[in-house]
Every structure is written in structure tokens, then in C-alpha cells.
Amino acid sequence: MAYIEGNTGKWEYVIGLEIHAQISSKSKLFSGSSTIFAANPNSQVSYVDAAMPGMLPVLNKHCVHQAIKTGLGLKAKINKYSVFDRKNYFYADLPQGYQISQFYYPIVQNGTMEIPTSTGDLKTIRINRLHLEQDAGKSMHDQSPHYSFIDLNRAGIGLMEIVTEPDISSPEEAAEFVKKLRNLLRYIGSCDGDMEKGSMRCDANISVRRSGEPLGTRCEIKNINSIRNIIKAIEFEAKRQVDLLESGEEIIQETRLFNADSGETRTMRLKEEALDYRYFPDPDLLPLVISDELINELKANLPELPDQKIEKYTKEFSLSKYDAEVIVADESVAEYFEKAANECNPKMLTNWLTSELFGQLNKASIGINECKITPSNFAKLVKLIENDTISGKIAKTVFEIMFETGKAPDKIVEEKGLVQVSDNNVLNTVIDEVIAENPESVEGYRSGKDKLFGFFVGQVMKKTGGKANPTLVNQLLKEKLSS
């Protein structure tokens, strides 16, 4: 467990998260308007989104399915009966004067997610609920010195709000939870998890306490927009609360905003309670009733999820848990890996994938889907190394050409004449030449200067243009030098 070091001793973090995940859907939660990102302002607004009188909401079935699939991925209970409620408050970018949400009877409850801790153990984070709700529009205050503008393109877009219990005990655990949840949503296809575009936003409820004491007064930090800022915001807010408590002041329950530039939180408003929103069932929407048949159908069609892939990679491919997690962290990488792993040694493939390929992708600032090397060609390269057709050193040269051109490795090896020299007679001839040309070094090695062995290996590799089989060179050199 992580602690905050105060002037009067240690304090514990108590953290709960609320994740707002924009549902991957071509249309909004209660209207047919498009959800394309960065469209011209107010170009994707229906009469329903603009709350014109007499316009009634119609529930998007696809959004419901996405929420159910996400609930299944979170090992949660899917409620067969749920209700939409009106959450009443006034914002300029909320034309209805209320938000349609689910307060009393959410669609999903009682889920769990396991995250790795700093000790290497797994920790279970309980998920209180997942409910459906509609997003608000966007207020823009920097377009004119005299006016604020409203863009309603986002108004009515479907959101899944995923709420954890206060089980998170450090900023790093909070970051791990969000990373793992984002990856799960991407595998399921229910949210793209792009925090920069705002399609996944995080609110953190933070309090501090002495070990063994009751929960303290919490403050909510709104709209944290990156993994890094989750850590920074929690660290700052927890330290702020500790400083107040140690100076004899009380924590005021409030909503605060995190400033990424200053790394500080500031007061936004006093924290509201449920009564302030006057929740009541939306009279324009019938209760949502979900059948066992639908749940079973969606469950049967779920893709293989990250934890399942990690288990498969460690058991079937004998990868370390760390390597499996690195590959599974990106669905595109996992898909690429599986296609290649069916044709070559998975462990050797992993080494090349996580070192050489990741390095080149980062250098070129591209994703694996933009890589010119096909999974099949990558597997061929690994097999050429496995079969001693080329050395690891030559393989790096071949790999660089493949990355630039997309050519098959066997073609490159053939064109460049890079086949590894593994003929004993040829290598013995080269070794004899090296020994004859360096009598003083031979005498030094035989008198106990073992480090000179590397010199002889280097000379053989130089004479063969780096194409000599290094394992065979080592074996033959030892025989020659010890005779």
C-alpha cells in the first residue's frame, strides 16, 4: 500500500473512479444523429438533441448491446430490468434542462477487475455499476471576447458511466485500472478509449485517512484527460487534503478541476448530493427489459478478452506473464503476434517483436497496422534465424530492409548473398588463416589471456563478412586454439 508522508505521520489514499466512456456507435443514444468526431459545429444535431418541443427520445439498441457486452467483460450482473431517469440541472450546453441517465435501476451492477500492484500481486477492484446516459454539448468561451458559443454535436451521444468502489489505494493503481479498462473496452469494441479526443474521461473521488480510521471527506476531481494526469491529480489532491488536516482544518466536500499546466486542483463547485438533481423516471421512455436469450447471444459473440489472451500466451506459447501483457496491451499487436506465432517459434518471435519491431515503430511514429512487414514475413525471418540460415546480426540487417521495403526475408537474403556460412571446411580454412596471421595473440591466449578469444571470433566474422555461424565458430576456434 502506498502512503502520503505528512508532517505528523503516514496517511492512506482512498480512491474511487468514475469513467465516462463514449459508446462506439454511428448514432446517438436517443436520436439518429451522427457521432463523427470533429464535424462542423452544430452539424450533427437533430430536433431531439436540441430538445425541440414534442420531440421524443428513441433508444438506440446498439448502445444497449454495447453496455451489456461491457458488463459481461467486467464479470458483472446484467440487470434484466432497468430504468432511465431524468437528472435535473441547468447548463447552457444541456438544452433539455435535464440529462437522461440511470440512477435507481442501472443496466449493469457488481462487476470486478483485477489489476497488478507494485508488489506484483493482483488486486480486485469492485465495480459498483455501469449505467447508460447521454452526453452534454460543448460550451466554447475562447471564440469571441464578447460571447460564448454552444456546439451541440456532442449532445445526446451515448455514454457508459463505470463507477468503482473506493478500493484503489494509490495513484499508480488508479492509472493501472484505467489502462486495463481502456484496453478491455477496445477489445470488446464498445469504446475507442481515446482520452485526447474526450471519448474516455475520468473523474476521481479522493479522500485520505490514518490507517484503521473511518473514511474521510472526499473531493471529486473532474474530467482528467490522460493516464499521466490521473497520477498527478490524485497526488496533488491527496497532499492538499493532508496539509489541511494536519493544520487543523476540515475538508469541504466539493467538486474540483485539475489544471494540467500547474499540476494543481481548484474549486469548481460544492459537491452535489442526489437530492439536488431531483431524479425521477423519464416518462418518455419505457423501462428497459433484457432477455436471457439476448444476454447469452452477446456473451457467445464476445471476442477473446485481454486476460484470456494472457493466459493462452503463457500456457500455449510459454511466454512470460510480462511479455504476454506487453503484447496484449494493444489489440492490433496481439492480432499480429498470433498470425505470426502460428508459423514460427513464439518465444523468439516475442523477443524480436518487443525489441526490434517496437523500436522501429516508435522511431517511425507509426502503429503496427501501418507496418510494411506482414506477420507471415516476420515469421519467415524468425525461421531463418531458427534454422541457422542467417545469424542474429545478419537478421537485423535483413529486418531493417524488410521494414523499409516490405520485402520477404528469404528474397533479401538471396539477393544480398547473406546466407550464413555453416560449412566446417570453409570455417576451418578461415580460422587457420586467422591463427596464422596472429601468432602473438595465439601465444597470449594459450598462456591464459582468455579475453583474446573474442578477438579471434571478431577476425573470423570480419573475414566472412559477418556471415559465419557464431555458434560453430566458437566451437571450432576452441578446438583449434586448445590443440
Curated annotation (Swiss-Prot):
<dbReference type="GO" id="GO:0006412">
    <property type="term" value="P:translation"/>
</dbReference>
<keyword id="KW-0648">Protein biosynthesis</keyword>
<keyword id="KW-0436">Ligase</keyword>
<dbReference type="GO" id="GO:0005524">
    <property type="term" value="F:ATP binding"/>
</dbReference>
<dbReference type="InterPro" id="IPR006075">
    <property type="entry name" value="Asn/Gln-tRNA_Trfase_suB/E_cat"/>
</dbReference>
<dbReference type="InterPro" id="IPR014746">
    <property type="entry name" value="Gln_synth/guanido_kin_cat_dom"/>
</dbReference>
<dbReference type="InterPro" id="IPR003789">
    <property type="entry name" value="Asn/Gln_tRNA_amidoTrase-B-like"/>
</dbReference>
<dbReference type="InterPro" id="IPR017959">
    <property type="entry name" value="Asn/Gln-tRNA_amidoTrfase_suB/E"/>
</dbReference>
<dbReference type="Pfam" id="PF02934">
    <property type="entry name" value="GatB_N"/>
</dbReference>
<dbReference type="InterPro" id="IPR017958">
    <property type="entry name" value="Gln-tRNA_amidoTrfase_suB_CS"/>
</dbReference>
<dbReference type="InterPro" id="IPR042114">
    <property type="entry name" value="GatB_C_1"/>
</dbReference>
<comment type="function">
    <text>Allows the formation of correctly charged Asn-tRNA(Asn) or Gln-tRNA(Gln) through the transamidation of misacylated Asp-tRNA(Asn) or Glu-tRNA(Gln) in organisms which lack either or both of asparaginyl-tRNA or glutaminyl-tRNA synthetases. The reaction takes place in the presence of glutamine and ATP through an activated phospho-Asp-tRNA(Asn) or phospho-Glu-tRNA(Gln).</text>
</comment>
<protein>
    <recommendedName>
        <fullName>Aspartyl/glutamyl-tRNA(Asn/Gln) amidotransferase subunit B</fullName>
        <ecNumber>6.3.5.-</ecNumber>
    </recommendedName>
</protein>
<dbReference type="GO" id="GO:0050566">
    <property type="term" value="F:asparaginyl-tRNA synthase (glutamine-hydrolyzing) activity"/>
</dbReference>
<dbReference type="GO" id="GO:0070681">
    <property type="term" value="P:glutaminyl-tRNAGln biosynthesis via transamidation"/>
</dbReference>
<dbReference type="InterPro" id="IPR023168">
    <property type="entry name" value="GatB_Yqey_C_2"/>
</dbReference>
<dbReference type="InterPro" id="IPR018027">
    <property type="entry name" value="Asn/Gln_amidotransferase"/>
</dbReference>
<keyword id="KW-0547">Nucleotide-binding</keyword>
<dbReference type="Pfam" id="PF02637">
    <property type="entry name" value="GatB_Yqey"/>
</dbReference>
<comment type="similarity">
    <text>Belongs to the GatB/GatE family. GatB subfamily.</text>
</comment>
<keyword id="KW-0067">ATP-binding</keyword>
<dbReference type="InterPro" id="IPR004413">
    <property type="entry name" value="GatB"/>
</dbReference>
<dbReference type="GO" id="GO:0050567">
    <property type="term" value="F:glutaminyl-tRNA synthase (glutamine-hydrolyzing) activity"/>
</dbReference>
<comment type="subunit">
    <text>Heterotrimer of A, B and C subunits.</text>
</comment>
